[in-house]
Amino acid sequence: MAKYRFGDICEVLNGRAYKQNELLSSGKYPILRVGNFFSSDRWYYSDMELPENKYCDNEDLLFAWSASFGPKIWDGGKVIYHYHIWKLIPNKEIADKFYLYYWLCHSVNRLTAGTHGSVMAHMTKGDMENQQIELPSLQMQKKVSSILRTIDEKIELNNKINNNLEEQALALFKSYFIDYDNFNGQAPDTWEKGVLGDFVEIKRGGSPRPIQNYLSDSGLHWLKISDATCITSPFINEIKEYIIEDGLKKTVFLKAGALVLSNSATPGLPKILDIDTCIHDGWLYFSTSRLSNEYLYLFFKHIREKLVALGNGSVFTNLKTDILKNYPTFLPTNEVLSEFDSIVKPLFEMILATTREIKNLTTLRDTLLPKLMSGELDVSELDV
């Protein structure tokens, strides 16, 4: 392998800094901020015409360098990238773009271990440019990146399958319970009218405090909002943090299969657990319910924007339990609910199976990544 200074084999371009009054609610170009980099949080727009190097487009290599860190091969069309994101342009005669992407994935923890800044941890452009990188031959780089991309492409395909299945389930929910397509366009008189709290018991999780005294490297899973926002599937099957058993006295332990709803940070987000976990007071759960988890999941997805509007405006940090308990709704007859569940449950079962496959593929990729980067796995004889 040959050793290089990162800035000598890859150009690092700064994005554009914006004043708040320049961020529009609609416009010609979306502005890619760090908040949109790892999720689909609220977007801002601009009508400004900028130099071409202030835009990124599909298959551009980007790196978020402030607050949240990491690389991405962009696939969201032409956007303006914010100042806290770099566009990286490799020298194609020396470095393969996709190999650099995986090198950055592998190296991000090391790269950011020495970050500095009084308000937000960040890297500087000089920090990145002065990194040392060892590169095999260009041919070998392309072999390594091809192996990893094959796995990532399968993961992406599975995510698209899941999104399609969920869209089908949401369309069925809308047809049955919003448009009443099977009931002449209106809710039947036989459906019980009331508020959500009449049909579902809503409770809040709990947090042992100070939480730092209970966090551990092993023990009981500790579900955070970030575990939910980092996955598009309805199901959560990976949780990063743990607490010790003493924390059980002041929290709520839920078994796999339970439905939870976020009520802080990113409120109104429903998820179904595929793993046992404790939940803090930023989560709501449903101890008893006359409605299935699948029905409730789709119900919460449908009313999420309305719940936000009932909070402190368009953006709020907490979803009050009373707002949810007093939300007007109805209880369809058992026959209708059984018919609906018989259609959507198989869709959710397929989503769950695919979500588990995604986890296995992710584990495989993350296991191969350091071995391929270090050369521990010799792929020189592979024909890829």
Where are the regions that the model predicts?
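Sequence-specific dsDNA recognition surfaces
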Residues: 4-22, 27-58, 81, 197-213, ...
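A short beta-sheet element
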Residues: 33-35, 47-107, 224-225, 241-304, ...
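Non-catalytic DNA-recognition/assembly elements of restriction-modification systems
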Residues: 1-17, 130-207, 330, 334-379
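A short glycine-rich beta-alpha junction/loop motif
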Residues: 79-86, 117-145, 277-283, 313-338
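ATP/adenylate-binding site constellation spanning eukaryotic-like Ser/Thr protein kinases
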Residues: 125, 170, 225, 321, ...
